């Protein structure tokens, strides 16, 4: 039975409607999938950028923290150096004051004579040479001569050795030093410095740990004394 034109048109419309509906559904499916993929990619990009930003600021924060530590360490070192310099300056001032007071000892002739007696005899014992030369300030010559005369017999008794001790009258010690003597062996290759300044420096060096402790307290980090 042949279809009429109306039936043909109806079937064609039905087929076109079906095709159109299927096309729309396919388009919607494609759009939905594209939107889903877009959202996934967008989320991935956002997360990647967020991680990069977090990593950047974490790195910056660590750098700033490290810079703070370095600056703090530098400030602490500078402060420590200032304290050490201040301590050294104070100790130097104390030593300079002590050196200035040596002149008072020299002005007391009786006290100075006793001191010279000890310095000369000590120098002889340190050298233990058969011939020794004593140098002193020109103004101290009489006192040093008396000290040498006292020291020779004491030296001979103690060492059971003879000794020749001369006072150098050609090259005196500088007048600006506080006093004391220098003692040489016969060829002047060995010297014992027993000037008042050298003795004070030696005593100061030996007592430096005690001086620091008295002035600034004990150092908890110091295992050995100077």
Curated annotation (Swiss-Prot):
What GO terms are given for molecular function?
A: ATPase binding; proton-transporting ATPase activity, rotational mechanism
Query: Residues bearing N-acetylalanine?
Result: 2
Q: Name one GO biological process term.
A: proton transmembrane transport
> GO cellular component annotations, sorted alphabetically?
apical plasma membrane; clathrin-coated vesicle membrane; cytoplasm; cytosol; endosome; microvillus; mitochondrion; synaptic vesicle membrane
Where are residues bearing Phosphotyrosine located in the sequence?
56
Ordered alphabetically, the record's keywords are: Acetylation, Cell membrane, Cytoplasmic vesicle, Hydrogen ion transport, Ion transport, Membrane, Phosphoprotein, Synapse, Transport
Function of this protein? Answer: Subunit of the V1 complex of vacuolar(H+)-ATPase (V-ATPase), a multisubunit enzyme composed of a peripheral complex (V1) that hydrolyzes ATP and a membrane integral complex (V0) that translocates protons. V-ATPase is responsible for acidifying and maintaining the pH of intracellular compartments and in some cell types, is targeted to the plasma membrane, where it is responsible for acidifying the extracellular environment.
Q: Report the protein name in the record.
A: V-type proton ATPase subunit E 1
* Protein source organism: Mus musculus (Mouse)
What taxonomic lineage is listed for the species of origin? Answer: Eukaryota, Metazoa, Chordata, Craniata, Vertebrata
Originating gene: Atp6v1e1
């Amino acid at each position: 039975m042949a279809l009429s034109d109306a039936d043909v048109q109806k079937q064609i419309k039905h087929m076109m409607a079906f095709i159109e509906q299927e096309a729309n559904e396919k388009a919607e499916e494609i759009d939905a999938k594209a939107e889903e993929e877009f959202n996934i990619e967008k989320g991935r990009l956002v997360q990647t950028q967020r991680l990069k930003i977090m990593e950047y600021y974490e790195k910056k924060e660590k750098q700033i923290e490290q810079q703070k530590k370095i600056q703090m360490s530098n400030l602490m070192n500078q402060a420590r150096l200032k304290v050490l310099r201040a301590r050294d300056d104070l100790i130097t001032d104390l030593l300079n004051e002590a050196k200035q007071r040596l002149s008072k000892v020299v002005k007391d002739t009786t006290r100075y004579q006793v001191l010279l007696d000890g310095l000369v005899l000590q120098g002889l014992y340190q050298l233990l040479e058969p011939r020794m030369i004593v140098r002193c300030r020109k103004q101290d010559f009489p006192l040093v001569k008396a000290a040498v005369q006292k020291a020779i017999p004491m030296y001979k008794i103690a060492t059971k050795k003879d000794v020749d001790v001369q006072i150098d009258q050609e090259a005196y010690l500088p007048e600006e030093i506080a006093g004391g003597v220098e003692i040489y062996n016969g060829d002047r290759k060995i010297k014992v410095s027993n000037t008042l300044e050298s003795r004070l420096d030696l005593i100061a060096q030996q007592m430096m740990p005690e001086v620091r402790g008295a002035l600034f307290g004990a150092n908890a980090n110091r295992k050995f004394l100077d």
